[in-house]
Amino acid sequence: MSTLTKSDMIEHLMSHLNLTRQEGRCLVENFFDELSESLIDGKEVKLSGFGNFELKDKNSRPGRNPKTGEPVAVSARRVVTFKTGQKFRQQVDERLFDQ
């Protein structure tokens, strides 16, 4: 299994949309900036046909230091989760079973 990077996305935009490297980089960076800013501002991000980025609040809880085994308190925090859309999930499942 390989990894898709921002550079790969830029290369794809360059070849498929005939963009310059600078235009492709600007498009990719602006997309991720907008996504990040929306989440930082407390908004959910819904990408139709792909999935949703949601904010979840985690309560504080007891935990352990893995090195020492000593009990520690894990503070409350907000985390970003991603839930795949049904259409995208089906496409991934179909691709896995076709291989």
From Swiss-Prot:
Keywords: DNA recombination, DNA-binding, Transcription, Transcription regulation, Translation regulation. Transmembrane segments: none annotated. GO terms for biological process: DNA recombination; positive regulation of metabolic process; regulation of DNA-templated transcription; regulation of translation. Pfam families: Bac_DNA_binding. The keyword Transcription regulation applies. CDD domains: IHF_A. One of its GO terms (cellular component) is cytosol. GO terms for molecular function: DNA binding; structural constituent of chromatin. PANTHER family: DNA-BINDING PROTEIN HU, INTEGRATION HOST FACTOR SUBUNIT ALPHA. This protein is one of the two subunits of integration host factor, a specific DNA-binding protein that functions in genetic recombination as well as in transcriptional and translational control. Belongs to the bacterial histone-like protein family. Heterodimer of an alpha and a beta chain. This is Integration host factor subunit alpha. It comes from Psychrobacter arcticus (strain DSM 17307 / VKM B-2377 / 273-4). The gene is ihfA.
